[in-house]
């Protein structure tokens, strides 16, 4: 006997007493997609980023600071 799952407010799951497991109702099977557990690699996603003028300015300042620190370390090694 199938009874609606009282813990699920959307009615997607029901409790199957025969197997004593939660199952997905037939009304929502088309919305459900299983994850293939035997797959080790998935498709790659394109990654995009946005760099503002402030980002560029801050990166330039950091780069210049690195150069100053590197050059002062080289001078102190002499």
From Swiss-Prot:
GO CC annotations, alphabetized: COP9 signalosome; cytoplasm
Name of the top EC class for this enzyme: hydrolase
UniProt-annotated location(s): Cytoplasm; Nucleus
Tree of life domain: Eukaryota
TM regions (residue ranges): none
Cofactor list: a divalent metal cation
GO biological process: proteolysis; red, far-red light phototransduction
Role summary: Probable protease subunit of the COP9 signalosome complex (CSN), a complex involved in various cellular and developmental processes such as photomorphogenesis and auxin and jasmonate responses. The CSN complex is an essential regulator of the ubiquitin (Ubl) conjugation pathway by mediating the deneddylation of the cullin subunits of the SCF-type E3 ligase complexes, leading to decrease the Ubl ligase activity of SCF. In the complex, it probably acts as the catalytic center that mediates the cleavage of Nedd8 from cullins.
Annotated family: Belongs to the peptidase M67A family. CSN5 subfamily.
Self-association and partners: Component of the CSN complex, probably composed of CSN1, CSN2, CSN3, CSN4, CSN5 (CSN5A or CSN5B), CSN6 (CSN6A or CSN6B), CSN7 and CSN8.
Protein name: COP9 signalosome complex subunit 5b
Source organism per UniProt: Brassica oleracea
């Amino acid at each position: 006997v199938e009874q609606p799952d009282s813990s699920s407010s959307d009615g997607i799951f029901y409790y199957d007493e025969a197997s004593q497991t939660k199952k997905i109702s037939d009304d929502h099977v088309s919305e459900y997609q299983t994850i293939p557990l035997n797959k080790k690699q998935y498709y790659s996603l394109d990654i995009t980023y946005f760099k503002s003028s402030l980002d560029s300015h801050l990166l330039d300042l950091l780069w210049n600071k690195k150069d100053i620190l590197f050059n002062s370390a080289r001078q102190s090694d002499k």
